[in-house]
Amino acid sequence: MKNKLDYRFVEGYWLDQQQIASIENDTQNTLVIAGAGTGKTTTIIGKIKWILNKWKLEEENIPPPKILAVSFTHASRVELEERILAEILQDDLVFKIYHPEDFIEVETFHSLALKIIKDRLLGRRLEESGFESFLKLSKPDLPEEKIEDFAHLYSLIRNYHVDSVEVKELIQKRFRHFWQKEDLSQNLAKLEELEILVGQYEEHLEKNHSIDFAGLLEEAMEQINPIFAYDYVIIDEYQDISPLEYLLIRNLRQLRPFKLFCVGDDWQTIYQFAGSEISLILNFEKCWGETSKFKIERTYRFPEKLVKLSGKFIMKDRTQLRKQIRGAPVYVKDQIVEINGPSERTDLNSLYFFFLNMPEHASVFLIGRYNFDIKKISRCEFLTFEKSEEKVLISMHERPDLRISFLSAHKSKGLQADYVLIINCRNTVLGFPSRMKENDVYNMVREIAIQRLGQRKINKKSCGKFSEERRLFYVAITRARKRIFFLTVREKESPFILELREEEELNTYYLD
């Protein structure tokens, strides 16, 4: 009789040896570094099946081990839960006795925090709109650029679990060594203005009996109840974790020394602007203690040529963890193409012929560095546009069968299409990579948090230029299942494109 909890067989596929080795390891801390498209979620499902299979074979007379699986967004949490239940509920002998809710919880960090403090909410509601929306409504005269800047800084301070007083002290110290007097007064004035606005925001929350997401996590850290003691904690997309989320999980471990199983890809750490901290995955062992480390390097998403090109590109940043990703040996003519014209308009007009000759029912992503890059494509008269929640849906009258979407590089993460076209690959301030100057105060917030967590500071020289932009470009490249196109303008090519031209996998087509 077939074992329905066979962890080597997940969702109709046999797992590879690297996946199985990581699953069978049962040490206190496990870090699985998995490349794009290598089957991170199937590995997590396999791990849960392994835990239940082990329990069933050894200790079926006691309740199953309590498992917490954490994902980062509501959509990914729902998908993960559905996929886990679809696999484990096949074993009807186990679930005649136990209900999955008795031993497995699938949460986001916020839903977990909400569960922890549920009894202490005392009628408070969750303020989902947050600080930025508060500023837009209460400060209509404040320029939008300033609102975004304050909202970003506030988000970093909260997610990095740093106090603005500490930032002020570091600003004073930095002034003595590096800054001009005007830099000092400008940065101190910004923090003082932020403190006033935050005070007003906190009054607004109190008046409306509300709590925001960061407050939820902070309160949960202090109110952990023994009913939240777990035997296993599994974290998906670990590279996206913030210091505040890390501290919540660390506090949970004080209740019971659970076994930790984390799956992530440092090459795809692209949410630093929202509080993700790459040193938490690069210095994992320093955070959690002795760790068993595994790699999953066989991708099921894209062909070998694209794997080779993208891997060489990302590993030019020497701080990234080394991986040798292997792809499918699929031959498609011109898998990696640069379209180089004398102007952006020429490049975009050429899309008409590319779209016209694409296979039937192909899926296509147009990826920009910024959301506003859609304005460039909107000049194409042969395309029509329809806004949806996460992306812009595009249609072409002559090819209604094509499924075309525009997304920013950040929003493309986790998604894939047959054909990907990266637009705006130009060497400009708002090109790709972005040359927007890094904010000194943002960097100081990170610095304080890293020191407090006992982390080793990342050496910027070893990262090379544009380290986060490089990871973002890598994410955009690896959305393609079949072919990737880069749209460039002659004599204004992105430095990333100049790098890629050195590789034999890239074919450049020059337009007149």
Question: Where are the predicted features?
Answer:
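Helicase P-loop NTPase motor core
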Residues: L31, T38-I44, E290-S292, R298-E398, ...
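Conserved two-lobed SF2 helicase motor
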Residues: E105-S111, D212-A220, D401-K411
